[in-house]
From Swiss-Prot:
One of its GO terms (biological process) is rRNA processing. Pfam families: Alba. This is Uncharacterized protein At2g34160. The modification N-acetylmethionine is found at residue 1. InterPro entries: Alba-like_dom_sf, DNA/RNA-bd_Alba-like, UCP030333_Alba. GO terms for cellular component: endoplasmic reticulum; nucleus. Homotetramer. It comes from the Eukaryota. GO terms for molecular function: mRNA binding.
Length: 130
């Protein structure tokens, strides 16, 4: 029984802060297509990506998701909404903020679309050099 307890105590749980495929989206720090391109890279590396946002940045996450879906790169796997308590710096009391987490997986055409996009980019660079 003691061995089981030691095993449970030594387990490494994947907490939210440890997820390698999570992108926390802000609507003020980076442009929209930064997140679109970052999500594509994460899907290439991990096969899926989790987009997460609070408050006003939720619209940005939804827009990034729709761009990836409409262009055939991704399929929705899971959408989760919740509220989180965040301390207001000015008043020191907790304020509730809306939170969304959208998990996207690579579409069947993902690799094909990425290869075509890379080919177009290389062609454009070759034309610039000539």
């Amino acid at each position: 029984m003691e061995e089981i307890t030691d095993g449970v105590n030594n387990m490494n749980l994947a907490t939210d802060s440890q997820k390698k495929n999570r992108i926390q989206v802000s609507n003020t720090k980076k442009p929209l297509f930064f997140y679109v391109n970052l999500a594509k890279r994460y899907m290439q590396q991990y096969n899926d990506v989790e987009l997460s946002a609070l408050g006003m940045a939720i619209a940005t996450v939804v827009t990034v998701t729709e761009i990836l879906k409409n262009n055939g790169f991704a399929v929705e796997k899971k959408i989760m909404t919740s509220t989180v308590d965040i301390k207001d710096d000015a008043r020191g009391r907790p304020v509730q903020k809306a939170k969304i987490e959208i998990t996207l997986v690579k579409s069947e055409k993902f690799d094909e679309l990425m290869a075509a996009a890379n080919e177009e980019k290389e062609d454009a660079e070759a034309q610039v050099q000539n």
